[in-house]
């Protein structure tokens, strides 16, 4: 018998959805992404500075719902599931102050965001304006980072890498429309 594996779905630019966070959460996606700016002392969510709205805070759209759900679900993302949730935080403004503000906010809820406190905690992955690998240690250990394909990480730095990103166009010219043809599947090693 073959064990059933969950399909890992990522909600890219989740804040653009009709119901940010909730729409993806209801589908039990594996990963939700929010683009975050530190703007006027607040962590705001949006794709560009001109898109920012004072009511679209990272705390209100993502952190508070997660804190509520973890309280309701016995310390896990979904009450009847052992699956973990990943929250990708794409830093869109200056790395250090933005990440410090994110860490300060998440640090108020270790039972939700720190796997050392709760093994079922949300996995936090920082992408976008990722700090230099030498600076990873400045941030709490529960914050992990999106790595780059050609970086030369030390073993300690590699421990902080959650995933490695690469430009898809380096491997295939498929534009995502229609079915992928056999040549592109072969190029990706998926046939």
Name every feature range the model reports, one short phrase each.
Residues 2-15, 20-33, 37-191:
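Catalytic cores of phosphodiester-bond hydrolases, prominently lipid phosphodiesterases
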